[in-house]
UniProtKB/Swiss-Prot annotation:
CDD domains the record matches: 7tmA_5-HT6 (cd15054)
Gene that this polypeptide is encoded by: Htr6
GO cellular component, one term: synapse
Membrane-spanning intervals of the chain: 28-52, 63-88, 97-122, 143-167, 186-209, 267-293, 300-323
Protein's name according to its UniProt entry: 5-hydroxytryptamine receptor 6
Single GO BP term: response to estradiol
SS bond partners: 99-180
Carbohydrate attachment residues: 9
InterPro entries: 5HT6_rcpt, GPCR_Rhodpsn, GPCR_Rhodpsn_7TM
Organism of provenance: Rattus norvegicus
Cytoplasmic topological intervals: 53-62, 123-142, 210-266, 324-436
Recorded family membership: Belongs to the G-protein coupled receptor 1 family.
Residue positions binding serotonin: 106, 288
SMART domains in UniProt: 7TM_GPCR_Srsx
PROSITE patterns for the chain: G_PROTEIN_RECEP_F1_1, G_PROTEIN_RECEP_F1_2
């Protein structure tokens, strides 16, 4: 969102020879700006293709991300290249009629990017605070309607005022000859900045703060529920040997620490997202208002702050997928050279050996899956009858369940002798024995 066409009562800038190009350091500046442009276009294009080609990513929530990446891609392809030429040469070097059109696209694309960030925060807010009702509230037609509304508002805040000359009402300043800068009046700047930045920023702060509070509350509830369930399970177990003193409290502290770390990670994630948004865009809008009030911002400083705002379109496709596991996995499948490290879960002690095969309660997707719990013995598989050696760590082995075998046959738990085994059942589900 930059810059400023026209003298008083004219929607086109004043033209003349203009200042010469910057004599020193222009090569390094051009190289840096080219890197920003290429990175912005490549990253946003990659993520748009990734969402469109990976079935796991085609959901309602990612509609908003596609809209965000589309607006950021337009910033990289339509807005940044003319802005780079304008910064390097110190004047508008393209066709005279393109100045107003480029300025309108500049305002529209950057405003659409900010409004899409607001929609993403709203979507996350509904998903976290009411996950059971989310599918009913955020349907695909409603998501598309919100996206269309955001783009319509961005277009109305850019093309309509500039074409009708509303930005010139009450203005008494003219740009330098050969410049393409939007020297808008103070009323226009206040209204446009409020609609496209300050109101969406307030909504983003509100939703992310509510998400943070909800994440902390859920972490505390899950920690207390888990420790309470573990304690109740211990009271009902027939323990053949006396557990070590302090074992229960140590495991409870470990679980509480785990959920505290999750809440801290959520806090850091939201802090990074909010921090990057305000660091990149807030200086520009403050300078834009100051420029309309006192004309005390130099063109060079204004260009730097403008490019800082453009960099938000570069950071969005890097920051948002960075904290989303689905994007990491899809990117690893889409790009063979990218290897995502496996997820590390807290190691739990393996259960004792037994000659039986166990089936978890959660085996809804496969009635044929069994959980191999033996460490050193061999289990006769119910299908082939061939022995199968079990590793030291639990692993899933897909086997057809014999016809007539109930999904959860009655029988005592396979193991229930210590707190660690109870925690294992809390994590992976209740375990029932299945006769071979």
């Amino acid at each position: 969102m930059v810059p400023e066409p026209g003298p008083v009562n004219s929607s086109t800038p004043a033209w003349g020879p203009g200042p010469p190009p910057a004599p020193g350091g222009s090569g390094w500046v051009a190289a840096a700006l080219c890197v920003v442009i290429v990175l912005t276009a490549a990253a946003n294009s990659l993520l748009i293709v990734l969402i469109c080609t990976q079935p796991a990513l085609r959901n309602t929530s990612n509609f908003f991300l596609v809209s965000l990446f589309t607006s950021d891609l337009m910033v990289g392809l339509v807005v940044m290249p003319p802005a780079m030429l304008n910064a390097l040469y110190g004047r508008w070097v393209l066709a005279r009629g393109l100045c107003l059109l480029w300025t309108a696209f500049d305002v529209m694309c950057c405003s659409a990017s900010i409004l899409n960030l607001c929609l993403i925060s709203l979507d996350r807010y509904l998903l976290i605070l009411s996950p059971l009702r989310y599918k009913l509230r955020m349907t695909a037609p409603r998501a598309l309607a919100l996206i269309l509304g955001a783009w319509s508002l961005a277009a109305l805040a850019s093309f309509l005022p500039l074409l009708l000359g509303w930005h010139e009402l009450g203005k008494a300043r003219t740009p330098a000859p050969g410049q393409c800068r939007l020297l808008a009046s103070l009323p226009f700047v206040l209204v446009a900045s409020g609609v496209t930045f300050f109101l969406p920023s307030g909504a983003i702060c509100f939703t992310y703060c509510r998400i943070l509070l909800a994440a902390r509350k859920q972490a505390v509830q899950v920690a207390s529920l888990t420790t309470g369930t573990a304690g109740q399970a211990l009271e009902t177990l027939q323990v053949p040997r006396t557990p070590r003193p302090g074992m229960e409290s140590a495991d409870s502290r470990r679980l509480a620490t785990k959920h505290s770390r999750k809440a801290l990670k959520a806090s850091l994630t939201l802090g990074i997202l909010l921090g990057m948004f305000f660091v990149t865009w807030l200086p520009f809008f403050v300078a834009n208002i100051a420029q309309a009030v006192c004309d005390c911002i130099s063109p060079g400083l204004f260009d730097v702050l403008t490019w800082l705002g453009y960099c938000n379109s570069t950071m969005n496709p890097i920051i948002y997928p960075l904290f989303m596991r689905d994007f990491k996995r899809a990117l690893g499948r889409f790009l063979p050279c990218v290897h995502c490290p496996p997820e590390h879960r807290p190691a739990l002690p393996p259960p004792p050996c037994g000659p039986l095969t166990a089936v978890p309660d959660q085996a809804s997707a496969c009635s044929r899956c069994c959980l191999c719990l033996c460490r050193q013995t061999q289990i006769q598989t119910p299908l082939q009858g061939a022995p199968r050696a079990c590793s030291s760590q639990p692993s899933f082995c897909c086997l057809e369940r014999p016809p007539g075998t109930p999904r959860h046959p009655p029988g005592p738990p396979l193991w229930s002798t210590s707190l660690s085994q109870t925690l294992w059942s809390l994590r992976y589900g209740r375990i029932h024995s299945v006769p071979p």
